[in-house]
């Protein structure tokens, strides 16, 4: 990944939160 935009950070953060909830 050569593009680091706020949208990408937000997407990655939301994905990690989703995985965290799914693994509970």
UniProtKB/Swiss-Prot annotation:
Cross-link Pyrroloquinoline quinone (Glu-Tyr) placement: 16-20
Function: Required for coenzyme pyrroloquinoline quinone (PQQ) biosynthesis. PQQ is probably formed by cross-linking a specific glutamate to a specific tyrosine residue and excising these residues from the peptide.
Pathway assigned in UniProt: Cofactor biosynthesis; pyrroloquinoline quinone biosynthesis
Domain of life: Bacteria
GO BP terms: pyrroloquinoline quinone biosynthetic process
Keywords per UniProt: PQQ biosynthesis
NCBIfam families: PQQ_syn_pqqA
Chain segments annotated as transmembrane: none
Keyword Cell membrane attributed: no
Lineage of source species: Bacteria, Pseudomonadati, Pseudomonadota, Betaproteobacteria, Burkholderiales
Database matches in InterPro entries: PQQ_synth_PqqA
Protein name per UniProt: Coenzyme PQQ synthesis protein A
Organism for this UniProt entry: Cupriavidus taiwanensis (strain DSM 17343 / BCRC 17206 / CCUG 44338 / CIP 107171 / LMG 19424 / R1)
């Amino acid at each position: 990944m050569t593009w680091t935009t706020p949208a990408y950070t937000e997407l990655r953060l939301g994905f990690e939160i989703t995985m965290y909830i799914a693994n509970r």
